[in-house]
């Protein structure tokens, strides 16, 4: 599946290379491909190499829909399927600052027969809300994502 997503993104992105530096940064009916570039947990026993990839679709009615694949805090492959919305906060020079909130279903947390005794690993699949702050420059995006009370993550992305 990761190969399919990569090929899809590469083909779609190559078709729009000439438009990468357009001044319009909020493109309706567009996709955003993101990669997690840094993760930090307050507890060192948790995974800080999440290998996150996500693909989001931004509709004409300001809603976003997405899917993300990553290695969770317990080094297990996981998925997040979600919807959400962005909220403009401030524009400073050519940078746009936005708030973003997503809500969806996360799957892949397993307690491995009691090895990880947390509420989320007992359910394996659970609803979740994730807030983030975003900096946008033209079609390039950078997010700071809150990981509940466990830490934070930085992602970077390209809108096409």
Question: Model-flagged regions — what are they?
Answer:
Residues 40-49, 69-80, 123-125, 141-159:
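Solvent-exposed loop/turn segments connecting transmembrane beta-strands
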Residues 35, 53-57, 67, 81-87, ...:
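Residues on the lipid-exposed face of transmembrane beta-strands in outer-membrane beta-barrel proteins
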Residues 46, 97-128:
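Outer-membrane beta-barrel translocator/channel fold
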Residues 1-3:
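Sec-dependent signal peptide recognition
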Residues 27-69:
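N-terminal leader/targeting helix
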Residues 16-29, 61-62, 88-99:
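Short loop/turn motifs that connect adjacent beta-strands in outer-membrane beta-barrel proteins
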Residues 50, 60-62, 76-80, 94-100, ...:
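Short connector loops at helix/strand junctions that flank enzyme active sites
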Residues 9-12:
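N-terminal signal peptide c-region/cleavage motif recognized by signal peptidases
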């Amino acid at each position: 599946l990761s190969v399919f997503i990569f090929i899809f993104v590469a083909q779609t992105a190559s078709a729009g290379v000439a438009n990468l530096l357009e001044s319009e940064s909020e493109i309706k009916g567009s996709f955003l491909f993101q990669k997690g570039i840094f993760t930090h947990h307050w507890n060192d026993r948790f995974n800080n190499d999440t290998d996150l990839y996500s693909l989001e679709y931004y509709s004409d009615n300001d809603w976003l829909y997405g899917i993300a694949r990553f290695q969770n805090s317990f080094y297990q492959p996981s998925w997040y399927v979600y919807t959400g919305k962005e909220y403009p906060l401030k524009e400073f020079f050519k940078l746009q600052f936005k708030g973003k909130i997503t809500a969806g279903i996360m799957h892949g947390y397993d307690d491995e027969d009691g090895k990880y005794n947390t509420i989320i690993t007992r359910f394996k699949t659970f609803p979740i809300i994730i807030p983030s702050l975003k900096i946008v420059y033209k079609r390039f995006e950078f997010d700071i994502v809150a990981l509940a009370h466990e830490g934070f993550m930085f992602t970077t992305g390209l809108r096409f």
